[in-house]
Amino acid sequence: MKNISEYLNYPLSKPIGFLLTDIDDTMTTDGQLTSEAYASLFKLQRAGIKVIPITGRPAGWCEMIARFWPVAGVVGENGGFYFHYADKKMHRWFSQSTGVRVDNQKKLEIIQAEVLKQVPGAEISSDQFCRLTDLAIDFCEDVKRLPNSDVKKIVQIFENHQAIAKISSIHVNGWFGTHTKLSTSLTMLKNLFGLTPDEAQQ
């Protein structure tokens, strides 16, 4: 990873209009959002740069982030949805229909039971109660860090059920579907700001 200072004099073909960023261990330091990091969001907003957090964190968190942070929207649960607050109204877009999400939650409950049975020390993430599209298994946030072999075992259990599983810095997140952080970010940029995928990635 390179220090951002290396890019201070990087030539740009046009001004920066958007900043898409992770939250955990990117915006946060030791699990906390510092005053400096939060203040920087307001500075970016004043500079005309639209900030969009892209996170594996749950719908409950994203509701608050979209409503109270100076951001243009937020992509949550690894692309399961995006939320956008404007004109005193929360706008929510989901990668899947309500019926599909309900069916997937039932399948995730089976995976949850299997993980807790087969991987001692693993726990359901403390924020699982406000998730709508995925299952998050805690392997080091609020539990003693599990060995890498156990983390890989959790991933394998998800994959044995044909679910997608991704390892973050604190959780293994699993879901059903083809959505990703990138795909939903591109959908959000198109729906809200009219950017094509090519324009968004320039």
Regions found by a protein language model. Give the residues of each.
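Non-catalytic pre-domain segments flanking phosphatase-related domains
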Residues: M1-T21, N191
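Alpha-helix termination/capping residues and helix-transition junctions
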Residues: S13, F68, G194-P197
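The start of beta-strands in P-loop NTPase/AAA+ ATPase cores
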Residues: G17-L19, A72, Q201
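Active-site phosphate-binding/coordination module
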Residues: L33-D127
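Conserved acidic, metal-coordinating active-site core of Asp-based
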Residues: I111-Q202
